[in-house]
């Protein structure tokens, strides 16, 4: 499966929160990541599975 073509079920986004800030997440289709604006982190999605580990998250540039 091409990671660039994966999608996130909107129902899943309603359930998931950032493990650090407990805030809502949004899906970044271009980078295939779940983004926490509050924590300024982007969590990768690999093989259709969100990796919700702070240690795996990418910091968003200011």
Curated annotation (Swiss-Prot):
SUPFAM superfamilies: Trm112p-like. Signal peptide: none annotated. HAMAP family: UPF0434 (MF_01187). Belongs to the UPF0434 family. It comes from Rhizobium leguminosarum bv. trifolii (strain WSM2304). One of its GO terms (cellular component) is cytosol. It comes from the Bacteria. This is UPF0434 protein Rleg2_3773.
